[in-house]
């Protein structure tokens, strides 16, 4: 063996030793790994994006909900998922807007179904959750295509589809090559066929939203039916009594499917508390949810939830 070949072998050996054999995933791959592992810890979902201030990351002002600024803030602070709403404008363009009108979130008025993309592009988004007193920003109404492009490779999207446009939405996701970076969800009752196995829904991460009719539905039975010959990524919980949770946890464990809940407002599990309570005492609210079997939490306070998760993962 020549001196040159010895040096080459030595260099290759050093490179091999320097590279971890099973390096932990990073970026969006790490988020995918966390979501798809039911034992992967808390998944942080930012409701309508990170529109709240995030002072620990230098964001002292609010951003408009469902905006590119709110998405980019989520990426910057390390949120796992941005939840955002999809509707169809008058010309068929899919856009990110929660309400059926533009009144609350922009400086315009009118029904979205009567406005084209050209109309929408003239409007400015109001900061945070909008309203007549909310300041105007330089942010504009975002198309689904723009939202997909801005999030690709950085963060997952949880698309709350507000119109009967599921096929068009999933087709757009597929064209963007983001089937494993997008969550779609739809409501499921006791008579609903397993949604995750249906065409379109079977191409993306899918969460059935369990319908709690009159607050007394057999949610565990609905979840069991939704897992029959299908594999949803999670069951999204409705507003519910705490007494309904243990049976759902048993179903989720039996089928290796996560549970997702909103801690928005007063919280969706009666007696557990909501975001305001959690910001004062995160372990009492978010910690209790997690210990009791709920591991995907949607919040308007993603920075605080991320900080709480970090304390759990230090141990």
PLM regions with names:
Residues 23-315:
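Phosphate-group recognition and catalysis centered on beta-loop-alpha active-site segments
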Residues 1-8:
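Bacterial N-terminal signal peptides that target proteins for export
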Residues 9-18:
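Bacterial N-terminal signal peptides
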